[in-house]
Curated annotation (Swiss-Prot):
Residues of the active site: 189 (nucleophile)
Protein name: Arginine biosynthesis bifunctional protein ArgJ
SUPFAM superfamilies, sorted: DmpA/ArgJ-like
GO molecular function list: glutamate N-acetyltransferase activity; L-glutamate N-acetyltransferase activity
Chain positions of site Involved in the stabilization of negative charge on the oxyanion by the formation of the oxyanion hole: 115-116
Protein localization: Cytoplasm
Listed PANTHER family: ARGININE BIOSYNTHESIS BIFUNCTIONAL PROTEIN ARGJ (PTHR23100), ARGININE BIOSYNTHESIS BIFUNCTIONAL PROTEIN ARGJ, MITOCHONDRIAL (PTHR23100:SF0)
Keyword Cytoplasm: yes
Major subcellular site: cytoplasm
EC number per UniProt: 2.3.1.35, 2.3.1.1
Highest classification ranks of the organism: Bacteria, Pseudomonadati, Pseudomonadota, Gammaproteobacteria, Pseudomonadales
GO BP, sorted A to Z: L-arginine biosynthetic process; ornithine biosynthetic process
Catalytic reaction list: N(2)-acetyl-L-ornithine + L-glutamate = N-acetyl-L-glutamate + L-ornithine; L-glutamate + acetyl-CoA = N-acetyl-L-glutamate + CoA + H(+)
Length: 405
């Protein structure tokens, strides 16, 4: 079940960015599993990619090509084309070449993306056979269909859109994402595509998506695994009648930054809300750190703990598990007598011990909620970080045990 995630909001079309969807039947016949995106000529494209050393063949190619001239993004679901060695690279190149031949662009102007089962050969012929139908379907209004087309174990499509006005010109930022499992920071089993009609230099665009992803996609964790295939792409088509943004300053840049960050945050949190088998959406706030890294270390120790995640699923306020996770986070010279821990607004531990005012009934009431905040005050400094995660349910085990069957 998705926690607090409803139907897609209105996804505003982005001038100069079209999407087309078709079926290659990669995992099952008739399923829409190929998405082609076309960028207007002169668009800037930037991206961030998985840090997994076993990164997939399409990731390797996309990273090589992203700073060049990009006209098309080609996505398939049902097959990750990861762990496939040189044949996987050959297969990824073949799909790009097939699309290039149909559209009259150079193959280097096509960026490939794949998601699905790892270690199986990419069914190149099936993808090639679906390309013309996807091209015939290209439309600026196809964001919702594309959000469905990139899904794997997701239960709902994910998207967000923002608009703002500058000097009388409306700028649009729209994005979609997919992901429900193998979610771990530094990009997870996640694909994200965000487009705007602003005109932005490639260097500024790259910094923008890096910073936006760092505060959103890179603060998610569902199961602690980092995928081989992740990426988040930001495309600026330059169709809006405004000057090019060439520096990370000024009113136009700040307005665009806010819109991009808002879209990143919304589609990133949607991934957690739709986490495989999730019944709880959990925010882990760590305040009072001496530096940001120790806040993250504590936050991830809590968010990754199977004992805490199963307690969340059971609505069991087992606060000792939270203290244990904080203590093993590896923060040097941690003074536990300064640590306070809260469940929602309830103080469960004060100065490293059970709070004198805390009752089990208070904790149980918070843990029964669908959305829970665990707040940890370290008392060491002024740094803070926030991470989003889920509980760990029977359904998560079932989904992943049956993934290839």
């Amino acid at each position: 079940m998705a926690v607090g995630l409803g139907p897609l909001p209105a996804l505003h079309p982005v001038p100069g960015f079209e999407l087309g969807i078709s079926s290659a039947g990669i995992k099952r016949p008739g399923r829409k599993d190929v998405v082609v995106m076309r960028c207007a000529e002169g668009s800037s494209v930037a991206g961030v990619f998985t840090l997994n050393a076993f990164c997939a063949a399409p990731v390797i190619l996309a990273k090589q090509r992203v700073q060049g001239t990009v006209r098309y993004l080609l996505t398939n679901t049902g097959n990750a084309n990861a762990g496939t060695g040189e044949p996987g690279l050959v297969a990824a190149r073949r799909t790009c070449e097939a699309l290039a031949q149909l559209t009259g662009v150079d193959a280097s102007a096509v960026l490939p993306y794949s998601t699905g089962v790892i270690g199986e050969p990419l069914p190149v012929e099936k993808i090639e056979g679906a390309l013309q139908a996807a091209l015939d379907d290209l439309s600026v209004d196809n964001w919702a269909a594309a959000a469905t087309g990139i899904m794997t174990t997701d239960t709902l499509p994910k998207g967000a859109s923002r608009q703002f006005t500058h000097d009388g010109v409306t700028i649009t930022v729209t994005g979609i994402s997919k992901g429900a499992g193998m979610i771990r920071p530094n990009m997870a089993t996640m694909l994200g595509y965000i487009a705007t009609d602003a005109k932005v230099s490639q260097s500024v665009l790259q910094d923008l998506i890096r910073d936006g992803a760092n505060k959103s996609f890179n603060r998610l964790t569902i199961d602690g695994d980092t995928s081989t295939n992740d990426c988040c792409m930001l495309i600026a088509t330059g169709q809006a009648d405004l000057p090019e943004i060439t520096e990370a300053k000024g009113l136009l840049f700040e307005a665009l930054k806010k819109a991009v960050f808002d879209v990143c945050m919304e589609v990133a949190q949607a991934i957690v809300r739709d986490g495989e088998g999730a019944t709880k959406f959990v925010t882990v706030e760590v305040n009072g750190g001496g530096n940001h890294q120790e806040c993250l270390d504590v936050g991830y120790a809590v968010a990754h703990s199977p004992l805490i995640k199963t307690a969340l699923f059971a609505s069991d306020p087992n606060w000792g598990r939270i203290l244990a996770a904080v203590g093993r986070a590896g923060v040097p010279d941690l003074d536990v007598s300064k640590i306070d821990v809260f469940l929602g607004g309830v103080c469960i531990a004060s100065q490293g011990c059970r709070a004198t005012t805390y009752t089990e009934e208070q904790g149980s009431a918070v843990m029964a909620e669908a959305e829970i905040t665990i707040r940890i005050e370290l008392g060491r400094g002024d740094c803070s970080e926030t991470i989003w995660t889920t509980d760990l349910s029977h359904e998560y085990v079932k989904i992943n045990a049956e993934y290839r069957t």
